């Protein structure tokens, strides 16, 4: 039976880029993979066809040859008839590169750098503003202290792979081309551990918790990240370790809210002080300070206290503290207080009292005009 066009197999156009081809392959590979496909009539040929098309169209040289010669470019001792045996590329190498995370596979590479780790650290506002040093304990993969990362039992050493002679790669003939792939014997490492370490069982790494002292600079905020170089997981077989990233989260404060380098707080005052003015104490992160409240202050008035905010983590400028005044309505009044308020209320009646509440007069005038317009 004639082989189908590779572009048709993947359902992409002839000018499709590599991203489109990989996307199509991923979708079809999941659909036809033997571990997931429950169709009894499917013998696996669909999956082989998709895999073959993907390998050709993601290799620039092979794709160029296919575009020029079609299937004939690969019919001489390579992939004729759609097979991947003999001189063909190993299935796990092709499929594992892209989808090892889906099916749990993926080939081993040369000794690689250790994985990065992340640690979420909660801080109080005071700690974030002033800076702090904290000890943290993290579980990670550390270099084996018996074999020192080699994976081999002390007194022995890994030996050079006889298949690839230490290169970690082998060359295979495919049609007009010679392709390179990971050595199937050593899985790309170039070495074989014949006598593995008893502690790490040849992995070169062991699970272990470690304690670190982390210095948090002054001025950090939620979302900031601190990098500790080389404090991540140990690399494979002596490769460099990854990094540890400390992710900062600042907890809510009962008094202050932070926006950038500025701090905000609400300051309640009684209506007598709002009307007559006076002096109050307000909190800052450095202690209490005096704030003068002018007469006739209204709710929502902002008072800026320069330099009482947060110093920038990058140095230099320092934010401000902004105090928002809230005029508080008195509660639990005594009879004497109620009587005094009634007398005050009576003084506001009539034209003489209009100047005491200009916003109220303006509002009432607006309401009156609104209803007058409705009745015209």
Swiss-Prot record:
Its cofactor is Zn(2+). One of its GO terms (biological process) is chaperone cofactor-dependent protein refolding. It is found in: Cytoplasm. Zn(2+) 2 binds at residues 161, 164, 183, 186. Zn(2+) 1 binds at residues 144, 147, 197, 200. CXXCXGXG motif repeats lie at residues 144-151, 161-168, 183-190, 197-204. The keyword Transferase does not apply. GO terms for cellular component: cytoplasm. GO terms for molecular function: ATP binding; heat shock protein binding; unfolded protein binding; zinc ion binding. PROSITE patterns: DNAJ_1 (PS00636), DNAJ_2 (PS50076), ZF_CR (PS51188). Residues 5-70 form the J domain. The keyword Zinc applies. Keywords: Chaperone, Cytoplasm, DNA replication, Metal-binding, Repeat, Stress response, Zinc, Zinc-finger. The J domain is necessary and sufficient to stimulate DnaK ATPase activity. Zinc center 1 plays an important role in the autonomous, DnaK-independent chaperone activity of DnaJ. Zinc center 2 is essential for interaction with DnaK and for DnaJ activity. Belongs to the DnaJ family. Homodimer. This is Chaperone protein DnaJ. It comes from Yersinia enterocolitica serotype O:8 / biotype 1B (strain NCTC 13174 / 8081). The gene is dnaJ.
């Amino acid at each position: 039976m004639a082989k189908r066009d590779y572009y048709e197999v993947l359902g992409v156009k002839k000018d499709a880029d590599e991203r489109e081809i990989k996307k199509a392959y991923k979708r079809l590979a999941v659909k036809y993979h033997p571990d997931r496909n429950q169709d009894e009539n499917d013998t696996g040929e669909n999956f082989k066809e998709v895999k073959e098309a993907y390998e050709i169209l993601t290799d620039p040289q092979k794709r160029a040859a296919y575009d020029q010669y079609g299937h004939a470019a690969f019919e001489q001792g390579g992939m004729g008839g759609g097979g991947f045996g003999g001189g063909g590329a190993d299935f796990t190498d092709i499929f594992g590169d892209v989808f090892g995370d889906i099916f749990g596979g993926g080939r081993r590479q040369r000794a690689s750098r250790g994985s990065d780790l992340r640690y979420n650290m909660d801080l109080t506002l005071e700690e974030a503003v002033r800076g702090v040093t904290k000890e943290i304990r993290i579980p990670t993969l550390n270099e084996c202290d018996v074999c020192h990362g080699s994976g081999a039992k002390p007194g022995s050493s890994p030996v050079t792979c006889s298949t690839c002679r230490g290169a970690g790669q082998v060359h295979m003939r495919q049609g007009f081309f010679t392709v390179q792939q990971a050595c199937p014997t050593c899985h790309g490492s170039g070495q074989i551990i014949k006598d593995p370490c008893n502690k790490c069982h040849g992995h070169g790494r062991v699970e272990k918790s470690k304690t670190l002292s982390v210095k948090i600079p002054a001025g950090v905020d939620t979302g900031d990240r601190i990098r500790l170089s080389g404090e991540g997981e140990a690399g494979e077989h002596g490769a460099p370790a990854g990094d540890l990233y400390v992710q900062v989260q600042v907890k809510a404060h009962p008094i202050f809210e932070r926006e950038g380098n500025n701090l905000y707080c609400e300051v309640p005052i009684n209506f007598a002080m709002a009307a007559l003015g006076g002096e109050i104490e307000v909190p800052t992160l450095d202690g209490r300070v005096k704030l003068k409240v002018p007469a006739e202050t209204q709710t929502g008035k902002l008072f800026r206290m320069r330099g009482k905010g947060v110093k920038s983590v990058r140095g230099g400028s320092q934010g401000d503290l902004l105090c928002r005044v809230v005029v508080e309505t008195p509660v639990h009044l005594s009879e004497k207080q109620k009587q005094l308020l009634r007398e005050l209320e009576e003084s506001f009646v009539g034209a003489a009292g209009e100047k005491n509440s200009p916003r109220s007069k303006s509002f009432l005038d607006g309401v009156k005009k609104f209803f007058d317009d409705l009745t015209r």
